[in-house]
A protein has these predicted regions:
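Beta1-alpha1 glycine-rich phosphate/pyrophosphate-binding loop at the start
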Residues: 1-72, 158-184
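A Rossmann-like FAD-binding core segment of flavoenzymes
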Residues: 25-27, 73-89, 96, 163-222
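Mid-domain beta-loop-alpha active-site segment that forms a flexible
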Residues: 151-159
């Protein structure tokens, strides 16, 4: 039997390893759409802090881990699935047949419909490529605006603080981490963050982003 797993994040990797234990003779193909080996997105802030290198984000450290388990790997993006014929079409035109298919592709960042959101200096923080781009832009002393001060936002914020940037954080809610913290707790976090030199703006959003005259970008708040 042939198993294909679309997505080589933690869920896909554990699924492939579990399948191998349960079906020692089956064909298992693990598919990811990035050049890097399977890695943990949750480790990216620690990469930005400099606590680990890129290899430290990898889910399995041994280079031959998947080969020893006879789990094949492929880089590509599935563009169509024919459940009748049980085939997958990849973006390079290649078809791959399967007996069982697991879709473990996870989620992706939502870019709010803000004019200028697609300018080159505007980054999400989701992939290793994102981390490389942020590291190239977020040099000590550079001015950075972070949109969002939720749980994940605060983890990324800490990494940016350690990079020595001049950081402004904009949060639409009335406090930091609004979905998890009470007003009192949110205020405590804000005071601590401001002591680290971060400017925090709550009850505000971004109206538009423009190319700046004296800096690469100008951000207009609403």
């Amino acid at each position: 039997m042939k198993h294909i797993i679309l997505g080589n994040g933690p869920a896909g990797v554990v699924a492939a390893e579990t399948l191998r234990r349960a079906a020692t003779g089956d064909d298992i193909l693990l598919v990811g759409n990035e050049d890097a080996p399977p890695y943990s997105r949750m480790a990216i802030p620690y990469l930005l802090e400099g606590n680990i290198d890129e290899r430290g984000t990898y889910l399995r450290k041994a280079d031959d881990h998947f080969a020893k388990l006879r789990i094949r790997q492929r880089r590509g993006r599935a563009v169509a699935v024919d459940t009748g014929k049980r085939t997958i079409l990849f973006d390079d035109g290649h078809f791959e047949p399967y007996d069982r298919l697991l879709v473990a592709t996870g989620s992706h960042p939502v870019r709010p419909p803000i004019p200028g959101i697609d300018l080159p200096q505007v980054q999400t923080c989701w992939t290793l490529d994102d981390a490389r781009a942020i590291a190239a832009l977020a040099k000590p002393g550079s001015r950075v605006l972070q949109l969002g001060a939720g749980f994940i936002g605060c983890i990324i914020m800490e990494a940016l603080i350690k990079r020595g940037v001049q950081l402004t954080v904009v949060e639409m809610g009335d406090r930091m981490v609004p979905r998890m913290m009470t007003p009192e707790a949110g205020s405590m976090i804000k005071r601590w963050v401001e002591k680290q030199g971060v400017r925090v703006v709550t009850k505000a959003g971004v109206e538009r982003i423009e190319n700046g005259e004296k800096s690469p970008l100008t951000v207009i708040l609403s």
